[in-house]
Amino acid sequence: MNVFQIRDKLKQRLAHLNVDFKFDREEETLRIYRQDNYKGVTIKLNAIVAKYEVQKEKIIDEIVYYVEEAIAQMDDESIEKMTNIQIMPVIRATSFDKKTKEGHRFIIEKHTAETNIYYALDLGKSYRLIDESMLESLGLTEQQVKEMSLFNIRKLKNEYKTDEVKGNIFYFVNSNDGYDASRILNTKFLDDIYQQCEGEMLVAVPHQDVLVIADIRNKTGYDVMAHLTMEFFTKGLVPITSLSFGYEKGHFEPIFILGKNNKQKRDSNVIQRLEANRKRFNNKK
């Protein structure tokens, strides 16, 4: 399955929507947008090709569902019709878009050197990222949006599965409610796990629908964590970061796990240099 076949398959599956399609051959993306207000989503086709090799039609079904929900909620009147507003935080990579296609700034809070916090209007089966143009319709300020979201994330259940690998304990939060990675913002939940840890506590948000917490009790645990995060990162529909974070008392410190049984914490100079290089690269695009 190649990029063109994926493009055609998606167009066929989404033909029932009142949308238009714009294919960018150079970027290998497909933009799907409403015919009434031109709002839409852009799909990176090359990423789907890689996932299709493993997941087959399942990944196509996921993309179609995501697009259908997103397009439906991009109706300009949808916000005004809402009676029960639910705001939630979502985690995204620092490379994620800072503005909408229309140029409106997303409401963003810095989280770590690898992640930012965005804020979303929960729509039941999906959500819509909040930008500055939506604040008036919501009747909220930026600060209110941020406070409401943190309050709401603490109300979610924190169910998880555990697994022991070569003496190390791993916790997996994977409820598929759209906010699994967001639970990294629930410090009480993390602190409760921290109290149970006998070794170093690491956390990771490789993609939107999983939070991995590890109690690293021996050197092998670092290698296992690196393998897990990379595997989740490559399979996620909305990937975030393949790096892990050391956690203690509400503080996150990104770490590299180098080679076999080694790790290296990232100092501020390294972080600043990486961020500067990333900005220069983005400016050249």
UniProtKB/Swiss-Prot annotation:
InterPro entries: DUF1444 (IPR010838). It comes from the Bacteria. Pfam families: DUF1444 (PF07285). HAMAP family: UPF0354. Belongs to the UPF0354 family. This is UPF0354 protein SH1179.
